[in-house]
Amino acid sequence: SLTASELLPGRERLLVSRAMSKAFAFAGARVGYLLADPAVIDALRLVRLPYHLSGITQAAALGALENAEVMLAMVEDIRQQRDRLLQELPGLGYTVCESQANFVLFGGVENPKALFEQLLSHDILIRDVGIPHHLRVTAGTEAETSYFLETLATLAR
């Protein structure tokens, strides 16, 4: 099977973009890349902001790309922990929203603010995304996921 980038030659209207946020653990950097015909890239250079990324962010992104094999190997670990969250949260009495991302939205939370604060007191930071009776947890390492699930099991829903 072909990758999208292999379809580029001879297709001047095809653009392939990819965010580096999840696979490269760069969520806060807001960085990605675009593959396209050189004429399209030249046209985009004319309209982009002059200082769209800091030098530090650019250097970090280049370092990540140079070590893509190592960085992308982490994706499978993240998927495993996400799938573990999807599997184990219902056993604790929560509903889960199916996810292909690096996080899981779970519901059935009686008081999201209180649970958020209880978890925070255990040094666990999750997100209250403003959906009633729901919270969002990011898939972490195996140890982080275990700690989250074990702690959550001891707290009131």
Task: Label the model's feature ranges.
Residues 1-5, 24:
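Conserved PLP phosphate-binding loop immediately N-terminal to the Schiff-base lysine helix
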Residues 7-11:
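Short, conserved loop/helix-junction motifs that constitute active-site signature segments
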Residues 13-90, 94-97:
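PLP-dependent aminotransferase class I/II
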Residues 78-79, 83-122, 135, 139:
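Conserved PLP-binding catalytic core of the aspartate aminotransferase-like
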Residues 117-121, 127-157:
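PLP-dependent enzyme catalytic core of the Aspartate aminotransferase-like
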